[in-house]
Amino acid sequence: MTRLTTIDTDALWDGIDEQRARTAGLLEGLTPEQWEHPSLCDGWTVRHVAAHLTMQQQRVRDALGFISRHPRILRSMPLNTFIHDAGVIQAQTLSTEEIIAAIRNGMGSRRHNLGLTPLETLTDILVHSQDIAIPLGVDLPMRPALSAAAATRRWDTRNTWLATVNRRLPLDSYQLRATDTDWSRGQGPDVSGPISAILLLLTGRTAALEHLTGDGADVLRLTQTRLA
């Protein structure tokens, strides 16, 4: 299981702030049509994903306040449905300007959602920033070291409840190998490429297969084609 030293934690939060700034900067330049463009998240537009990112720092009091204002959310179960519906409600509640401001206002804060660690916050901002950028054809950088930390956390927790919030791909029988940083996990047919693409694959984003090579990547692409 991934553990963090004090230095690691400082670097991690700096990286979270860096990606929040990049994401807010991207959002500031979008047209109204782009805000309503489908994201990589099923059933969510760019606006929904951005609104979800404003909820990264909710504690118990914040969550209870949200539920009291929107009691119908209690009918949204299981967890993935709750997260989806909360993002939709938040997107309806906040204006474009308020969403961007809320993401920027999170910079410098070290609060994270109850029951999670800063590594989940990192994964959330990295992956969801790509959920916004990729469908819009925007290249939004992610630092390989940060993507590697998030990928390690996702691999280590792939059989826990934390993995239930992502689409699960059958990756245990493959070797995942980054080509831009020293990172590899698993055994089996090779799946190679940038660590950013591996992170997206670990979180169920099959769009990442476009940037991955190897016998294993070919098998995964064929499997996804058959399922389509």
Cite the ranges covered by each PLM segment.
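Structured surface interface patches that mediate subunit assembly and partner/cofactor docking
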Residues: 1-12, 59-76, 98-101, 105-228
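Alpha-helical scaffold segments that form or flank carboxylate-/histidine-based iron centers
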Residues: 4-15, 34-55, 83, 88, ...
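Soluble or luminal CAZymes and related metallo-dependent hydrolases
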Residues: 15-19, 95
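Amphipathic, well-ordered alpha-helical segments in soluble domains
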Residues: 19-22, 26, 99
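Extracellular-facing binding/remodeling surfaces
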Residues: 27-35
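A short, structured beta-strand-centered segment in the mid-to-C-terminal lobe
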Residues: 82-98, 102
